[in-house]
Amino acid sequence: MSSTTSLPVAREGGQLQWLWKRDLTHYPVGGYRVFLLAVVVLANIVFTWTVAAGAAATPVIFPHFGMTLGYYANLLVVAGVVGGLASYISSWGDRWGRANMVVIGLLINGLFALFAIPLAPNKFAFALLTCLLYLADGAIFVGTPALVRDFSPQMQRGLAMGFWTFGPVAGYFVLSAVARAYLPLNVTFANWQNLYRFSGYAALVMFVVCLVFLRELPAGIRSQRMAALNERVLVEVKARGLDLAEATKHRWRQMIHVNTIASSIAINLFLVIYFTAVAYFVFYLPLFLHFSLSSFNGIQEIYWGVNIVALVVWGALSDWLRVRKPFMVLGSAGTIVAIILLMNAKAGVSFTAMALILSLLSTSLACCYAPWFASFTETLEARNPALIATGSSLYGFATRVVGVPFGLIIPHIVGSPVETASGWRTWYWICIGTVVVFVPFIFTMYGHWRPSTARKEFEEHEAKVAEELSRLRQESAAA
């Protein structure tokens, strides 16, 4: 139909309206599609960096503000609830679009990280401002995966969702790298504040990039399933007759099912060990295993770096084989093995040994998560491709729902002080249990177990697409 090599953006109604009217006129192809995906991924990285900026030096903030582990855990719980509310609001992205949510969220996070949080006078102000950061993050947590789904057909979805997960993963990788390079061995609150400022500068730069360049598909195009890029002409033709109001009617009734709600909760149960690594390894490794803060950030760099590579590799493999579920099972098994190794690590364990254990954990989490997210978006499309943001908000809300109870109970299980060996051992057994609970829900997801079955279904679908495209060409020639 058309090759989208320039910025194919509808700009009717004024020279500046393109800053908020972001609909493309055609499905993007080639380098421009890759560029749009890259912008979304970079935005997601910066979002994670701003929200987690202080995590690399959390032990310093506790004495500065007079916070306890219990207060910190409760803060994460409240912030998670706030993010969950934002997820619900952003579910309207099916009608309003997703791109402006990302742009506005970057501006909010940039201003708060650069100015507000570093100047927080007390722990209450710090907690309030952190919750506001999570409010913006909750909206973006829905908007960015929806955009990645929009720009990636199903045959490239595993790789695309692996790249989307770069946001949470690469955000922490950047944070660890900056912290290890910038923070001295004796960390003070003054240099800790700059971790937020660095992320704030990055967020404002990314805000300008997204304001100028980020675009999205019009509702008619994004509300359809597309298995491969060669279907884009057919999708654009069908979009002309699509009734969006009818397609999005009774949206919650359409999207709330076992394989959307229960699987969203189940994957977050699987990720309890991931949430533990994000929020509490900063205590566990330095205080229990006696690593310095610098060594901890070095191990974290390796952990997140391995995760980045693994997400792309596992996502690409699941695309190539056209199956997701076997990877989820393999990743679950590897995660259990890694937790057992971590549980049996003792004080004095070497840097290399701990890096290897966490690399196994990181690889296993990626093996399950990237294919799961690809399968989840395909499951949503099987329900109604016009309600991807609504379905994504279920996942975003489930992330917070699972985080609330676990955030409340972990301080009581690991004990205070944090160096309680029996408490951490109990917690790791709970993490193993949550992985086991996840496994049965793999069977509820959309998709096949055997590559041969998936390949046959795709070939049949391609034959139907070719037939429809041939009919369209004949009708066009006759006209």
Name every feature range the model reports, one short phrase each:
Residues 95-106, 319-333:
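Cytoplasmic membrane-interface "Motif A"-like loop-to-helix N-cap segments
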Residues 84-122:
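Conserved MFS/SLC helix-loop-helix module at the cytosolic interface between two early adjacent transmembrane helices
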